């Protein structure tokens, strides 16, 4: 008995005949999306392996899962004489939903990723081969996931980009809070918990939430976002290196070797570390050496006067008070795109 065909989407390329493409498209009540209702025998649709019951995912490379029937029809008609349809049968559709996978053309060629793969669908920056364990996730079996930033190209859809941006009080930066399934954000590879590094080539790590939102909206219909997942973020912070677009495909920063600082290896200026041993010699910017009080850097002194101690305690209480919320700007904490 032959083994069952593996589940995968199908990419159907249709060339229009004298009677059209030969299929009927319709929406189903209670189900999201557009479905193939009927395929005419001997038609271009049948020759392209389109089948009744298929759900339409993409038209000519554009995801249409969130579009209306009229919008989908117009996309099919937009390219004269031919069209490219990415579809899934019911069984494949259910498997994709169960595993929370976004359907792509790559899956039509390679099939669905292994069920045990924690990074499905496999991102562009995942490679295999021999790499340093400092720059990748260890895997005894051989494959390594390189810890690289990801450059996500988003083109705005009718419902926007399809992601929610928020700031976290416990840590600096802007984070992807959620990504809508089937949205431009999902198709670009953006994922929840990603930290935003750059918007359209500009570093936004030091910007306020409203400023980052303005940067994303600066271009009307598209955005280029450089992001890092939590593991990659931790790795680059450990090396004290700021991720850039060059790290997406170019050389990765090296870990500390023979006392060389990561910043020097990355081509930047070396900065002093707060983990230096107490009393160690350091060079000031003009090259002169000085001894550092091990408590001075943290704002403490070994022998404060009573007045100093009292003033310091008062200042610490003031600094701990949370700033009053400006309720007119409360919505800046979360922004939907």
From Swiss-Prot:
Residues 11-90, 150-230 form the PDZ domain. Coiled coil: none annotated. The keyword Membrane applies. Widely expressed. Keywords: Cell membrane, Membrane, Nucleus, Phosphoprotein, Repeat. It is a peripheral membrane protein. Residues 255-275 have a biased composition (Polar residues). It is found in: Endomembrane system; Nucleus; Apical cell membrane. Pfam families: EBP50_C, PDZ. Homodimer, and heterodimer with NHERF1. Binds PDZK1. Found in a complex with EZR, PODXL and NHERF2. Interacts (via the PDZ domains) with PODXL (via the C-terminal PDZ-binding motif DTHL); interaction is detected in glomerular epithelium cells. Binds ADRB2, SLC9A3, P2RY1, P2YR2, SRY, RDX and LPAR2. Interacts with MCC and PODXL. Interacts with SGK1 and KCNJ1/ROMK1. Interacts (via the PDZ domains) with SLC26A6 isoform 4 and isoform 5. Scaffold protein that connects plasma membrane proteins with members of the ezrin/moesin/radixin family and thereby helps to link them to the actin cytoskeleton and to regulate their surface expression. Necessary for cAMP-mediated phosphorylation and inhibition of SLC9A3. May also act as scaffold protein in the nucleus. This is Na(+)/H(+) exchange regulatory cofactor NHE-RF2. It comes from Homo sapiens.
């Amino acid at each position: 008995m032959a083994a069952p065909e593996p589940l995968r989407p199908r990419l159907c390329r249709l060339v229009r005949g004298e009677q059209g493409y030969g299929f009927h498209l319709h929406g189903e009540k209670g189900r999201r999306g557009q479905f193939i209702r009927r395929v005419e025998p001997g038609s271009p649709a049948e020759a392209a392996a389109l089948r009744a019951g298929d759900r339409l995912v993409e038209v000519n490379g554009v995801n249409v899962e969130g579009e209306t029937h009229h919008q989908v029809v117009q996309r099919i008609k937009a390219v004269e004489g031919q069209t490219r349809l990415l579809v899934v049968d019911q069984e494949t559709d259910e498997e994709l939903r169960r595993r929370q996978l976004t359907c792509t053309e790559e899956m039509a060629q390679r099939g669905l990723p292994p069920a045990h793969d924690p990074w499905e669908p496999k991102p562009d920056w995942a490679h295999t081969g021999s790499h340093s364990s400092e720059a990748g996730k260890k895997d005894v079996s051989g494959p390594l996931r390189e810890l690289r930033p990801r450059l996500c190209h988003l083109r705005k859809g009718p419902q926007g980009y399809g992601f929610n941006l928020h700031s976290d009080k416990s840590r600096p930066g802007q984070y992807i809070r959620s990504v809508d399934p089937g949205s431009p954000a999902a198709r670009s590879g953006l994922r929840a918990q990603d930290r935003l590094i750059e918007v359209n080539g500009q570093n936004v790590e030091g910007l306020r939430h409203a400023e980052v939102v303005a940067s994303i909206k600066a271009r009307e219909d598209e955005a280029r976002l450089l992001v890092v997942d939590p593991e990659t973020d931790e790795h680059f912070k450990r090396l004290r290196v700021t991720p850039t677009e060059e790290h997406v495909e170019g050389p990765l920063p090296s870990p500390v070797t023979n006392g060389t600082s990561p910043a020097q290896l990355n081509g930047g200026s070396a900065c002093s570390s707060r983990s230096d041993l107490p009393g160690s010699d350091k060079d000031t910017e003009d090259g002169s050496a000085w001894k550092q009080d091990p408590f001075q850097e943290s704002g403490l002194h070994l022998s404060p006067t009573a007045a100093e101690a009292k003033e310091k305690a008062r200042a610490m209480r003031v600094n701990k008070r949370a700033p009053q919320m400006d309720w007119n700007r409360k919505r800046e904490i979360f922004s939907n795109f």
